[in-house]
Regions:
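Intrinsically disordered, low-complexity terminal regions
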Residues: 1-335
Length: 335
């Protein structure tokens, strides 16, 4: 078995030209990939995305674990994107960062790609403990301004800091922390917490299975969110078009601006929306079970016999707010 010293790569000072396939020891360093649309694949480890200083994508690789020597790195154009792929040995992967009693399973192609929806590849299981290949890869990715990146990570954590470009993140069991992004952002996450701050772009799309979502200072033309379970908090939101669909968990939304359309469908959990005092919208609330409380002047107010629905006009009625809540209180308050 290699010593721990040989398993941890030494980051080279010079930037290396990346061949198609390298052993992990030789691949240690920072690499440049030319293009405008990139895809990065990594099964286990941390991925940090930062602002790049040039015209090319840069990727720094640090291999971890007793079996890190079995990792390989591959590049090249696949499906119209310039790719950087960490290829793991066959068999189960042990990644302690997942947690001792946790595991995730997916299908991985021989070229190291996964989660592209066609369901092909070998079965790979990643566990937090037990027997298997003990290896992971930590990546630091520098994204040039104005470029697009599709990031795939099965287990670990993703952080994004002060990036100017379009970003799509697809993670299995991995936390996501974004602080500073100017561009479109798409997230597809299985389970793990999501934190977003200082986002400004055309579209923001979030699809999560389970885990909390906390966002602050978010500005986008259109925002869509689909959450299976977990509390959702969106604070300081500027958008004219919002669509939120949550299965279970409390929803808190603080709007900075007027809206054209807000649609919110909540299975269970309380819904609290803070709006500007001059917001104008036609309001339609179906509360299911739970109280409905609107603490703003409401014109043309009407409700059914059981008081589990409410309709009316806020302000000039320019926009539209539609809320469908299965169970839990619904409150609309002045910000």
């Amino acid at each position: 078995m290699p010593s721990s010293r040989s398993c941890l790569p030494v980051i080279a000072a010079a930037l290396l030209t990346l061949p198609a396939l390298l052993p992990a020891q030789q691949a240690a360093g920072t690499y440049r990939v030319a293009g405008s649309h990139f895809a990065v694949y990594n099964l286990a480890g941390s991925v940090s995305v930062v602002a790049g200083s040039g015209d090319e994508l840069t990727v720094g690789v640090t291999a971890q674990g007793a079996d890190a020597a079995g990792l390989r790195v591959a590049t090249g154009e696949l499906r119209g994107r310039q790719t950087f792929r960490v290829i793991f040995p066959e068999g189960d992967i042990v990644y302690p960062g997942l947690g001792a009693h946790s595991e995730t399973q997916l299908q991985v192609r021989d070229d190291g790609t996964f989660d592209d929806s066609d369901g092909r590849g070998r079965d790979v299981r990643i566990r937090g403990s037990g027997s298997g290949t003990r290896a992971s890869a930590d990546l630091e990715v520098g994204l040039p301004a104005g470029r697009s990146l599709d990031l795939y990570l099965a287990a670990g954590e993703v952080s994004v800091r002060n990036v100017k470009g379009n970003l799509s993140v697809d993670v299995g069991s991995a936390s996501v922390d974004v602080d500073g992004l100017a561009g479109d952002f798409t997230l597809d996450a299985g389970s793990a917490p999501v934190r977003l701050a200082h986002i400004k772009g055309g579209t923001l799309s979030l699809d999560t299975g389970s885990g909390t979502i906390a966002a602050t200072d978010v500005s986008a033309t259109a925002i869509s969110l689909d959450s299976g379970s977990g509390d959702v908090t969106l604070d300081g939101v500027s958008s004219t078009d919002l669509s939120l669909d949550t299965g279970s968990g409390d929803v808190t939304l603080r709007l900075n601006t007027d809206i054209d359309q807000l649609m919110l469908d909540s299975g269970s959990g309380s819904v609290t929306i803070y709006v500007p005092p001059d917001l104008g919208a036609e309001l339609d609330v179906d509360g299911g079970s739970g109280d409905i409380d609107v603490q703003l002047p409401l014109l043309n107010r009407s409700s059914d016999e059981d008081d589990d629905s409410l309709r009316g006009t806020l302000g000039d009625g320019h926009g539209r707010i539609t809320i469908d809540s299965g169970s839990g209180d619904v409150r609309i308050l002045k910000r």
